[in-house]
Amino acid sequence: MSKKLFSIIFYSCVILVCILFLPSLIMPKNITIFGGKLLGHWSRFCLKFFLSTDIIVKGKENILNNENFFIACTHQSAFETFYLQTIFNSPVFILKKELLQIPIFGWYLKKIGSISINRNKVSKDNLGFFEDIFKTINSNNSPLIIFPQGTRVLPDERPSFKKGAARIYQELNIACQPVAIDSGYVWPKNCLLYTSPSPRDRTRSRMPSSA
């Protein structure tokens, strides 16, 4: 019952926030960003209240400050797309182009400056990708979040990493902040929730820029 309540109440609130924040699409971006942070804190509250699940964050002292960097994060559930917005300051997501085409949800992703890449096209068709990243980093002073696995995976899956994160690291010469998350044990992809140990967000020491 608690799992069903979680799903019903959490996603009902997500829909409500998306509707209430529609005016933010024509307002300053900070308003939309606040809505994302609100859902991040809401996800933590719901996990604790309905599933007695704590979020344990280790390594916050390793978070980079006062320099350009991007975040390479493992991807197991929808949880990290909400909660990482409460840890990092106004992050910008690098994501597959299809997500921007989702009504309402895609509008918000565009508003916060998300950068899309068409994974179905060869590299030469994505030449503007690194230019967009470079402009975003220099104009917004916001960290970028990329999921190198390319999609959500189960905790025991070990898919090969995509080349995007490595190319950003090499081409733009900026530091990388690795983040490991095990949220899939509690909030797995394409499944109903089930009770399990607390999700742990491990923020690891950075990889220095390649300079």
Please give the residue ranges for each predicted region.
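Catalytic core of membrane glycerolipid acyltransferases/transacylases, capturing the structured
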Residues: 21-26, 65-122
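Residue-level preference for the first positions of well-ordered beta-strands
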Residues: 68-70, 141-147
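Cofactor-binding loop segments of dinucleotide-utilizing enzymes, especially the Rossmann-like FAD-
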Residues: 96, 149, 181-182
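Soluble extracytoplasmic domains of inner/organellar membrane proteins
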Residues: 133, 149-157
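Hydrophobic alpha-helical segments, chiefly the membrane-spanning helices
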Residues: 207-211
